Amino acid sequence: MKPAADKITLIGAGLNGPLLAILLARRGFAVEIFERRPDMRRVRMSAGRSINLAVSTRGIYALQQAGLWEGMRNIIIPMRGRMMHSIAGELTFQPYGKNEAEVINSISRAELNIALMNAAEEHGATIHFNQRCTGYDLKSGAIRVRNEGTGEETTREAEVVIGCDGSASAIRGEMLRLSRFNFSQQYLDYGYKELTIPAGSHGEHVLETHALHIWPRGNHMLIALPNIDGTFACILFLPFEGTDSFAGLTTQVQVIQFFESRFPDAVPLMPQLANNYLANPTGAMVTIKCSPWHVEGRALLLGDAVHAIVPFFGQGLNCGFEDCTCLLDLLDRHGADWARVFREFENERKVNTDAIADMAIENFTEMRDRVADARFLFRKKVELALEAKYPGFFVPKYAMVTFHRIPYSVALARGKVQELMLAELSESINRIEDIDWGKADRLIRRDLTPLEIRQ
């Protein structure tokens, strides 16, 4: 049977599911979403993963396409750069971009999720909560759903299914049964734990508001993102095992002693530190790659279900949202020829999602180890000087990823070339004034072509 062109079933109402539902509904499709969790608008619950997210150009573009970005401005906080906290309590600010327009935006996962679900329903999508997808028959086009409250199992017709159901995707689980389905997952040896810096006595932020705060300490790191209520959402990254690890911090005394020795300026700001640490779960971080992403024109995987990445480039949300806009671009181009749309979607996206997965792991090392290194910081200044002198040719990798919609694979490839240039141009100098601009010009003209900028 040919898949129906007017009705789409989405699995998962996290972030990608509701956004995709809006984009599809705006084009006249009937959309149903099945979500295993209760409705977070009516039941107090954890967001499940990190409590704050970073929205940048790719995510903003997707929200604009859904007609939602302007309405989001009251729940975001622009972050203009990184505020580094040394172990001595000294602060160093590192701007993200070449000007104040290049910012990333902190947003509550729960607030964003609620806004997306509200908008999806306003556009006519139906969301079924407490309905866990337990399987999908790729031949008959039927999903199996279990009511999480009653345990009742039902079968629903679903001719076209898109799995937006995260790194533990049930739809991917069905695809794993297929011959020649490739799948890999790689966990970091590090975990994370959510903590909180409360607002001040008058509801104010007790640290600089418009910055991502980082306490880099080599093999461990604390970060803090601002919330609109004056609090900061903090995340501690530690190895699971070994010295200075989650395994070694199991009592209030151990936690306080560890923080006082590693993050002394943060301790006075966290009156419930030990209690929060011991009460909150320790999360794991995984990179998932697989192929194919689709089964003919019947089923497709999208977002974390097909390319989960670690959070250190702030691109998880942005990459997933870009999946949605890419899929809709192809749908606009080819109509409901789902087999062709799904095939071209994978061809276009996989090389790019593989690239951001690799860059996210690389950025972990940078955030954890290198952001406090003087030579690294000087090279960042050289990088900005090159961008200013050669606009359209030299764009820092971070900017290509974060402030433009340049394909991730292009950012990765050009980033490697530019890294070699930076090493050569910054070697043996300590001042921007000492850059050999003649050499820079020769390298730029030889190794870089003009870059197509998409913002």
Where are these regions (language model features)?
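C-terminal helical "tail/cap" subdomain of flavin- and related membrane-associated enzymes
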Residues: 2-6, 329-455
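Residues at the starts of beta-strands that form the adenosine-phosphate
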Residues: 7, 30, 317
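Conserved mid-domain beta->alpha element of the FAD-binding
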Residues: 11-26, 163, 195, 281-372, ...
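Conserved Rossmann-like nucleotide-cofactor binding loop
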Residues: 16, 39, 168
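Glycine-rich FAD pyrophosphate-binding loop
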Residues: 25-48
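Short phosphate-binding/catalytic loops that engage adenosine nucleotides
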Residues: 29, 68, 125
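Active-site-adjacent segment of FAD-dependent monooxygenases/related oxidoreductases
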Residues: 44-119
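Conserved FAD-binding catalytic core of PHBH/FMO-like flavoproteins
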Residues: 118, 122, 131-135, 140-285, ...
